[in-house]
Amino acid sequence: MFRARPVRVVMAATPLRGWQVDPATIRYVGEGLERPECILAEPDGTLWSADGRGGVVRIAPDGRQELILQSTVARNENSSFEDRYVNTMGSLPNGLAFDADGNFLIANFGTDSLELMTRDGRTRTLVDSIEGKPVGKANFVTRDSAGRLWLTVTTRMIPWTRHVETMSHDGYIAVIDERGVRIVADGLCGTNELRFDPAERFLYVAETTKRRVSRFEVLPGGALGPRETYGPENIGGFCDGIAFDAHGNLWSTLIMADRLVAVTPEGELLTLLDDGRPEATAALDAAWREERVTPDIMAQATGTIAPWMASLTFGGPDLKTVYLGSLRGSRIPWFRSPVAGLPLIYWNERRRAAA
């Protein structure tokens, strides 16, 4: 196990040790959502959810919601499980981030591109090829304090589930800045969400299919140092979403096992919520160990709170409300945490914009 150098903001023993989410306290927001994989929370209580119909859903603090479709795509509805989750047909907004003006950066798992969408749906493609090759399965995007964009690509395999079956190491991280777009880390296995520590000294990424979190030192000019494992070599499931809290704990959703865990700064793995089906999860784990995972085995493993639990977002005025994103859910579960989340770069930008 890698013993991480501290990323704590608050120098104190983690309140997460000995704490778990009480399922009876979980509440829900939104209804009729499609593939709410990623959620953005604003300081005023507004939520934005990626939506598999090809856009985002705005959920106002009073619960009213509005679907905003991308101007460049046809409405993506009524598709089969195989078309939506295996063949990823149509627009499938996956990872979301705000740009400096409050518009949406979209890593689109369906169109295999990085897109920019305004709040009224006008959309343009920012990146659809890198070094003369198609991007592949664009998964997540984030922004740093220098204005650079960081994009993860899970795999270049079509359909993407072939990557899970073969555990191919063809995922990568790309950076976009004034010099253009370039790959800064490759040979990764199921590259998914990525986050910075508070000082932006290290970049952390979920390697979903490898079932580990990796990190890279951020070097001058946007280069990355060598990969190193953060926390357990096997985090216990397919880590998908990751987010830091203010105590330096790195939370992660384990999709299909539908488990929420956290890695402490000391490298200890804590289970915060377990909503999976034990037998189906065990079958999936065995298939992963034997490199025989199939879409059918994956489909059987799921929970009920946030089916195919894919991400987590800290929100609320004190950043102690946790929202869970999912691939197969139609609403957003939320609960209260004993610790606040680490504010993302856009948090204070949106607070100033609302003032």
Located regions from the model:
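Beta-rich, blade/repeat-based domains predominating
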Residues: 30-44, 74-104, 131-157, 167-173, ...
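A short loop-to-beta-strand structural motif that recurs across blades of beta-propeller domains
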Residues: 55-57, 113-115, 171-174, 212-214, ...
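Short loop/turn segments immediately following beta-strands, especially the blade-tip
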Residues: 216-223, 265-270, 275-277, 336-345
